Amino acid sequence: MWGRLGAFLQQAVETREPTQDLLQSFIQHWKGVTQYYLETSDESCPARETDIPWRLRQLIDILVFEESNNGSQLSSGDEEDSGAGSHAGPCMEYLLQHKILETLCTLAKAEYPPGMRQQVLLFYSRLLAKVQRPLLHYLSVHRPVQKLIALAEDPVGATAQKEELQFLTAVCTKLEKDPSLLVHVLEEGSGSRVRCSGGEQDGETEARNHKPRQNLFKALLRLCTCQKGRLCVRAREALLRVLHSAQQEGPVHLIVQSKLSQYVTEHLCELHRCIPLSIHPCDITALQETDWRKDSGSQESDGMENAEAALQRFLCWVEYCDCLVRESHEVVAMEITRSIKEGYLQGILQPELLEVSELSILRSTAILTAVLHRFTATPLLRQFLTFLFGDERGPETRGDRGSQLRSQLIQRCNHLSDEISLASLRLFEEILQMPEEIALHSLVIRNLETRSYLAGGQDESRGQESETWDGAEELEEDPYFTDGFPDTGIRLPRSDNAHRTEPAGTEQWVKSFLSLVPEEIKSSDTGYDGYLQDAIVQYRACCQQVAQWGWPVSSKGTGHSQQEFYEGHFMEVLLGRLGGILDQPYDVNLQVTSLLSRLALFPHPNLQEYLLNPFITLAPGARSLFSVLVRVVADLAQRSLRVPDLQEMLLLVRRQLLANSANEQLNHVTLCRGAVVLEEFCKELAAAACVTHSPVGF
């Protein structure tokens, strides 16, 4: 209480002092700081127990009062004097001319008395935060600021991270308000000259004439990676604000010339290496919720917690890298992306992805899936997808597999290990959800653009209705459809409005998929209505995803190509997997059908024609999704003759799957589960055909 009263009285006295007395008071307090070093020989006394902290606070209070007093005089005086606002008072002039900041920086480096560095950091922080006039363009200010930033790596004395962050945050706040000042913090001191105004043009000239210092970014990134969660988050936010505000050519050039992108990538690689080899791949993909803004404390008690904490730190840094790219200038974003590609993708991840050990494959695939799940910045997505799949735009040929990495990732969807196949299929499911065309075009679209899957003699000008009924007659003659289109009890919506809005032929597309599985081997009498709502939601999401891709609204390509049709490596593997649905594990079947259903909902006319139109006439040697399903159903019909009571077994297996239990051991369980998945997949495709060719999809 008495201390506050004394401070109040002293402030009241100081407000009545004339300018000359204010300067004398400022000089007196500064001499009080220097006098300590002349009179005191006790080197063990901490700085906080001396009068140095109090005198430094008095210096700041005097400077703040002087500035506010000059501002009030300006507002009440002649407003035409535009230069008066930038005129420094006598106390500020004394601070600049007598190099007080340089002296304080020297005392901080010496760390005498103990804790002096913290006091100097606080003084700088308060000076930059409380004094409103620009200061960083002065040589006698930005040079000691540079030196104080560089002290972060000085082993002499232990700099408190809290005070250091407070100082760096104050510097970043000034840079955020005026990014042209960045040149005075990053430039080399040997070529610096005093400037009274940090204009944008001067900043750009300096940026090109001086090699940037690295201390600011190194200090910030060191705090960004510390174990104190709150300090870590504040440091990341400070760096993010600087990059977000630096949009002019000069600051952008300085940042690109700095080693910021290198430091970011190096820490990403370091965190990747810290992920224990013992961590299970499922734990990597299961960690869905991460946020770099949340505290990441270091309280870990056992090995498992250490592994999870290491993984979380890595994924949080991945998210932060994505945020840096999104918020930075385009040139800076491309530089960070390039560094991540060269340092992390090519240097760390690619060698792991190409390993042959099953555990290594599972681990690297899970990490890649988790990383891609967290990327939203366009430069990062494009760089990653181009790195994985290349930039070829022409159709694939059967003998050419492309890059080794692309070929390996696709082929692993059909790996001997079901676990690797599942992980690879989930990776591609993640990739297909990305708002970039690169992957989908490389995997599927480029092979369908010429429509060479169509027979050369097919009349493409005929209407949908004629095409539909001709195809229906062909199906009726198929030996696997001896009953034609049996009455399944399934009916499309029959309201007049719905009937008038559906294009001709859509109903026959739907019926074709619903009629694929014979009644004798069905395990459910429910229709495809349960899939319609999900199909509508997913179709709208797909339309939104591809809205900016410039896809055609109608099929293009003649269908007459001299080159043999090849569906591409990816579709070859998927259709091959679908062909083995009766002999594969249940989880693999679910993942394969999920991927194909997702592809069928993309609003590309050629893709929908190839996957959803049962009535196209295929070129010799070509296959479509429907033709593969016909063969699978034929195989199922043949096998059903050798399995007694198959329909009862199918009903029992369906109940077990719905209950997620397997209490009763059954024969032919893989076959029965495959048949159930096949039946439901046909319903999914029927819903997709209905939604994609009907206004209900919108």
From Swiss-Prot:
InterPro entries: FHIP, FHIP_C, FHIP_KELAA_motif
Domain of life: Eukaryota
Pfam family, one: DUF5917
Family: Belongs to the FHIP family.
Protein name as annotated: FHF complex subunit HOOK-interacting protein 2B
